[in-house]
A protein has these predicted regions:
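Intrinsically disordered, low-complexity eukaryotic regions enriched in glycine, serine
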Residues: 31-32, 44, 86, 102-103
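Conserved Walker A/P-loop ATP-binding site and its immediately adjacent core
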Residues: 83-97
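N-terminal pre-Walker A segment at the start of P-loop NTPase domains
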Residues: 1-40
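P-loop NTPase motor core of the ASCE superfamily
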Residues: 2-9, 40-59, 65, 78, ...
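A structural signal for isolated positions on well-ordered beta-strands in alpha/beta enzyme cores
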Residues: 84, 167-169, 229
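Conserved P-loop NTPase mechanochemical-coupling segment
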Residues: 95-112
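Conserved P-loop NTPase motor cores
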Residues: 52-73, 88-92, 109-212
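Post-Walker A helix-loop "phosphate-sensing" segment adjacent to the P-loop in P-loop NTPases
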Residues: 71-83
Length: 249
């Protein structure tokens, strides 16, 4: 991260010029998913077609959190017309009464391949043409993105998600497993306890704040198991679970 420091003696002056009163252009693809998501500050950031990354070691709580978000009737449940799941069989086997087991079989994929993702893309495009919202959950399939065709198709979905009315949730065990070209695409980060080296890299690549805040935040958030740090990359706002973290400047 480049840190820009103010140099003593340097000043800027703004000269006000005449300017046009431009009309506001409203994008039809920027609709909210459901007004219930605005009840909480954190879920407000999920109330549009975003990309959310969940990072954490095995048994850290990331899969449980995603499951809870989609199971709770006041959160993500009923927000999407279709939910597609890319998840190896063993990854979801540890959850009792897994809500994703109730998905239609043709919306569950046990491997992420170019052909499978292309099939989902076509179905999402058809639904988007009717104004319907979709969601894809990618769980433990990072290795499959080493395939260049699959990675390119994933990026197409990411870049066009607003027009496709698509939200994407991606679960990984480490930040370093995410391809570098994808790391700046995430709208939201849910970070469970990871190594200090990973946190330093996430902070350096994504967060435009002084590195001195990092030890304080890590100590606060990870003092008990299964807690997560939430970051909205557009606004820079951070949360200790559901409670906002305010930095004293």
């Amino acid at each position: 991260m480049i840190r820009i420091k103010e140099t003593p003696g340097c000043r800027i002056t703004i000269r006000q010029n005449p300017h046009p009163n431009l009309p506001k252009c409203e994008m039809v693809c920027d609709t909210m998913l459901h007004k219930k998501l605005d009840k909480y500050d954190l879920t407000h950031f999920l109330n549009t077609h975003t990309m959310s990354l969940f990072i954490g070691r095995p048994r850290s709580g990331k899969t449980s959190l995603v499951h809870s978000l989609f199971e709770h009737s006041h959160l993500l449940r009923y927000c999407f017309t279709k939910v597609y799941l890319f998840q190896p069989t063993q990854s979801g086997a540890s959850i009792k009464e897994n809500i994703f087991d109730t998905l239609p079989p043709d919306q569950i994929y046990r491997e992420l391949s170019y052909e499978n993702l292309e099939e989902v893309k076509i179905r999402i495009e058809e639904d988007a043409a009717q104004g319907l919202s979709s969601c894809i959950i990618f769980d433990d399939v990072t290795a499959e993105l080493k395939n260049k065709q699959t990675l390119q198709l994933f990026k197409q979905l990411a870049f066009n998600r607003r027009h496709l009315r698509l939200s994407m949730f991606f679960l990984v065990q480490t930040w370093f497993s995410v391809p570098k070209e994808l790391r700046r695409l995430w709208t939201n980060l849910f970070i469970f306890k990871v190594s200090k080296n990973e946190m330093v890299n996430i902070w350096d690549e994504i967060i435009e704040q002084d590195m001195g805040y990092l030890p304080l935040i890590m100590k606060q958030v990870y003092r008990v198991p299964y807690k997560f740090l939430f970051i909205n990359t557009d606004s820079g706002r951070m949360f200790d679970g559901w409670d906002e973290i305010l930095l004293d400047d």
